[in-house]
């Protein structure tokens, strides 16, 4: 069966992904274009370990062209009617929801996540467009008196300019809408470089933006298989005034250094190593349920996944039983198959890291109570959901983000001890704590050195909540009423009486 035939059995509208014919194209200046070189790269289906379809592989020069086009479009779009921005974003939201099934199916094909997870992400992604449509109408400044009685001060907010957006593969829809929704609402134009692993979901969002009436040049998308070269262009081109990146801390540091040459405004949402603390007075059933969503969602491939699970020694054994019981009920398999709860990891590199963390834990005294190996009967990218007990500080899993379906449970005895362990990390994105003591919830919640804390919940991501970290997890906030501010400059006008 040909590639297009395989796709058409799962996807209703191949045109949504620019797959009526191959390769899929990039979107620059309101036109769908292929690389002048004719180069393409293949996108893989990790669930079947086979090629999904080819995509055009654009050059750095073509990214440079997209930046110029975006700059030209910005000169008019920055002055666009905010009510028109609202209307366009609302149409985009409606189109995303109308095409949710195809978007989720493609996400499963190229990312591997179970279809239920993919459908949840599409809805989550659409909500950011809906939210920022409203935020376009709420951009406001203020006025004030001056220390000089003859002067008045007026403060206004203006779009920063062209924004370079670099997105990851683990949330191929939501990471685009969370950034682009805010940028377009603010009056900025964008050049997007989606992850090479998951370009089709991104291209579909560009198609729907075009259908919604986003003006030519306002949203541009460049697909490429050489991220570092295109990243250099986005971070050093003087026409780009802001870069927004979600990805690893190491890459974020490189982009920040490159951006310093032109002092660009930056939003960096980087890696985490989230502590998940279960105190002796916690509702253990609720905490175990929360851990399933927090640790194993997307097969553990999210930046806010619990990575270090600290359980008070008095409830440790009981909590291990609850967690093991739940994990053993997961169904690992191909994301489009009925009943599957967890899919494959994205690549062999991801598999290797998870194996390394499990092997290191076992060598240092950890015990695997369920899972712990590649499910080779399903394919090379499938790793069994795993629970490790007797975990200790000093294991790799306590020091590095695993980014896989491995839950390691550590014992602790005192609040001071566990807070110190939780904060003993160079990163600080998310943290979680479970306790019925409201004083402890506030005390520990404020003590954790992270940007987001889930208190008696395993879910911290919400359209209305500011998303972002501290320390080496980056800076800037996305979503919420604060998200649009990342794309606005504040200008003061001091006016004297004549």
From Swiss-Prot:
The active site is at residues 269, 303. One of its GO terms (cellular component) is mitochondrion. Pathway: Amino-acid degradation; 4-aminobutanoate degradation. Its EC number is 1.2.1.16. Transmembrane segments: none annotated. Keywords: Cytoplasm, NADP, Oxidoreductase. Its main location: cytoplasm. PROSITE patterns: ALDEHYDE_DEHYDR_GLU. It comes from the Eukaryota. NAD(+) binds at residues 247-252. One of its GO terms (biological process) is gamma-aminobutyric acid catabolic process. It catalyses: succinate semialdehyde + NAD(+) + H2O = succinate + NADH + 2 H(+); succinate semialdehyde + NADP(+) + H2O = succinate + NADPH + 2 H(+). The keyword NADP applies. It is found in: Cytoplasm. It holds the Pfam family Aldedh. One of its GO terms (molecular function) is succinate-semialdehyde dehydrogenase (NAD+) activity. Catalyzes the oxidation of succinate semialdehyde to succinate. Can utilize both NAD(+) or NADP(+) as a coenzyme. Functions in a gamma-aminobutyrate (GABA) degradation pathway that allows growth utilizing GABA as a nitrogen source. Functions in the GABA shunt, which allows to bypass 2 reactions in the TCA cycle by removing alpha-ketoglutarate from the cycle and feeding succinate and NADH back into the cycle. Homotetramer. NCBIfam families: SSADH. Belongs to the aldehyde dehydrogenase family. This is Succinate-semialdehyde dehydrogenase [NADP(+)] 1. It comes from Schizosaccharomyces pombe (strain 972 / ATCC 24843). The lineage of its organism: Eukaryota, Fungi, Dikarya, Ascomycota, Taphrinomycotina.
